UniProtKB/Swiss-Prot annotation:
Pfam families: Ribosomal_L22e. This is Large ribosomal subunit protein eL22. Component of the large ribosomal subunit. The ribosome is a large ribonucleoprotein complex responsible for the synthesis of proteins in the cell. Component of the large ribosomal subunit. Keywords: Cytoplasm, Ribonucleoprotein, Ribosomal protein. It comes from the Eukaryota.
Length: 128
């Protein structure tokens, strides 16, 4: 009996992986304590591609802003955690870290929320 030949598997090209992350800054922007355009500029200056900040890899990473939402799109591997790190760095720089926190509301997005301050109300009730 003749040996069976396995059919040749053609190696197709991998699909280009496009990563899209969203940062929702609606609450602080509406309250006027944060400027979305300033935050967008901060991200453009700080995001590193191939170890270099500020160049965004010649178009492989793009940042778009629509009102108070910032969208970061990347053709190369890009960490959502890195986006959170940069957001926290921006908040610290602008002295907003004490009032705002970065929360993941979906798998592809973060949201800036205020800290819930319920402890002060409970302490006041206990003193009565």
């Amino acid at each position: 009996m003749a040996p069976l030949k396995k059919p040749a598997v053609k190696g197709g090209k991998k699909k280009k992986q496009v990563l899209k992350f969203t940062l929702d800054c609606t609450h602080p922007v509406e309250d006027g304590i944060m400027d979305a355009a300033n935050f967008e500029q901060f991200l453009q200056e700080r995001i590193k591609v191939n170890g270099k900040a500020g160049n965004l890899g010649g178009g492989v990473v793009s940042i778009e802003r629509s009102k108070s939402k910032i969208t970061v799109t990347s053709d190369i591997p890009f960490s959502k955690r890195y986006l959170k790190y940069l957001t926290k760095k921006y908040l610290k720089k602008n002295n907003l870290r004490d009032w705002l926190r970065v929360v993941a509301n979906t798998k592809e997005s973060y949201e800036l929320r205020y800290f819930q301050i319920n402890q002060d109300e409970e302490e006041e009730e206990d003193e009565d």
